[in-house]
Curated annotation (Swiss-Prot):
Function, as annotated: Receptor for arginine vasopressin. The activity of this receptor is mediated by G proteins which activate a phosphatidyl-inositol-calcium second messenger system.
Originating organism: Ovis aries (Sheep)
Disulfide linkage: C123-C202
Positions with biased composition (Polar residues): 383-399
Protein name, UniProt field: Vasopressin V1a receptor
Length: 418
């Protein structure tokens, strides 16, 4: 990398979306001047490592595009009412597709051609969009977790124009991601990386010696550290709130019902049976979405942590040797950061089984899967209705309720509106 104000170019370019690239230490040779025969040194690289990088990026791109496109297709075709969680899943899938097309795909082409092939303006746009996709994926995860925090810890606020608030949060994540990634236009440009071979590449320029560490630290903090802190705080409050609710319900059961309640207690219990069941169902749905979001956050941290550790190490350690970056053990973890965009779609489908069913409906070859899901769903619904009719719903099965020895003919059952 070449630092502005430094006497000579550094050893590495920045073909990755960051100013540092663990896989491009092989460019140090073309900056050394003349070869052993006195002629210009060839512009070469570690071809074995380059092939490995190309293969990994190609697999990540294909899997990310297929997975996230399937989720978007399933959300579009689902006959169910769209929820706020579906809205966040849709935009997180769009952010993951942005990672695939704006970050992984340009890097794949760049690794194939070795040097950036394009004008200075295209160099700046590509670098901007690569970092924009990183910001969008991270910040969309933050707003989705914030929505789960509001739904669990402040449920009354969900009644106050929840759709409008969710759309504002999503729009803020997109706009903030675009704004925070604009410095890439001023950091990167087409630079002559060899005075001998007259080779140009898309490189970053920094003020020596503090520019590079400051930039990498800022990007690490804004893309990784700050989101992880916010996510951890939200989940801390969510877990504490759920723990308090569980403890309160346990204490209530231990107290038991008051004696002498008589027919009025039975009457109230009958009237509110469906309401209590609905509340329990909503609570289970919230907990399921909280679990799904937690798994997504964990996958984000696991995939991105090695990348940021390598970047911070290479920026702050003065003894860092660029020869070490030619080791696949150092280069591949930096590439696997984008693997997070491949994991998210399967997490959605695991926690929302109907998404897989709705996606299967779009492909004729998956009609057997569709019929299996439909048959299992019908059997499950039939079992639930039978159990509810025989045991819990006197308003739907008068005969069963009258046969009970504990029933009272003086009780009048009023239909409960749902």
């Amino acid at each position: 990398m070449r630092f502005s104000g430094s006497p000579s170019p550094g050893p590495s370019n920045s073909s990755r979306w960051w100013p540092l690239d663990a896989g491009d230490a092989n460019t140090s040779g073309d900056l050394a001047g003349l070869g052993e025969d006195g002629g210009p040194q060839a512009d070469t690289r570690n071809e074995e490592l380059a092939k490995l990088e190309i293969a990994v990026l190609a697999v990540i791109f294909v899997v990310a595009v297929l997975g996230n496109s399937s989720v978007l297709l399933a959300l579009h075709r689902t006959p169910r009412k769209t929820s706020r969680m579906h809205l966040f899943i849709r935009h997180l899938s769009l952010a993951d597709l942005a990672v695939a097309f704006f970050q992984v795909l340009p890097q794949l082409g760049w690794d194939i051609t070795y040097r950036f092939r394009g004008p200075d303006g295209l160099c700046r746009v590509v670098k901007h969009m690569q970092v924009f996709a990183m910001f969008a994926s991270a910040y969309m995860l933050v707003v989705m977790t914030a929505d789960r925090y509001i739904a669990v810890c402040h449920p009354l606020k969900t009644l106050q124009q929840p759709a409008r608030r969710s759309r504002l949060m999503i729009a803020a994540a997109w706009v903030l991601s675009f704004v925070l990634s604009t410095p890439q236009y001023f950091v990167f440009s087409m630079v002559e990386v060899s005075n001998v071979t007259k080779t140009y590449d898309c490189w970053a320029n920094f003020i020596h010696p503090w520019g590079l560490p400051a930039y990498v630290t800022w990007m690490t903090g804004s893309v990784f550290v700050a989101p992880v802190v916010i996510l951890g705080t939200c989940y801390g409050f969510i877990c504490y709130h759920i723990w308090r609710k569980v403890r309160g319900k346990t204490a209530g059961r231990q107290g038991g019902p008051a004696e002498g309640a008589g027919e009025s207690a039975l009457y109230r219990g009958v009237l509110h049976a469906r309401c209590v069941s609905s509340v329990k169902t909503i609570s289970r749905a919230k907990i399921r979405t909280v679990k799904m979001t937690f798994v997504i956050v964990t996958a984000y941290i696991v995939c991105w942590a090695p990348f940021f550790i390598i970047q911070m190490w290479s920026a702050w350690d003065k003894n860092f040797s660029w020869v070490e970056s030619e080791n696949p053990a150092t280069a591949i973890p930096a590439l696997l950061a984008s693997l997070n965009s491949c994991c998210n779609p399967w997490i959605y489908m695991f926690f929302s089984g109907h998404l897989l069913q709705d996606c299967a409906q779009s492909f004729p070859c998956c009609q057997n899967v569709k019929r299996t899901f439909t048959r299992e769903g019908s059997d499950s619904m039939s079992r639930r209705q039978t159990s509810f009719t025989n045991n819990r719903s006197p308003t739907n099965s008068m005969g069963t309720w009258k046969d009970s020895p504990k029933s009272s003919k003086s009780i009048k059952f009023i239909p409960v509106s749902t």
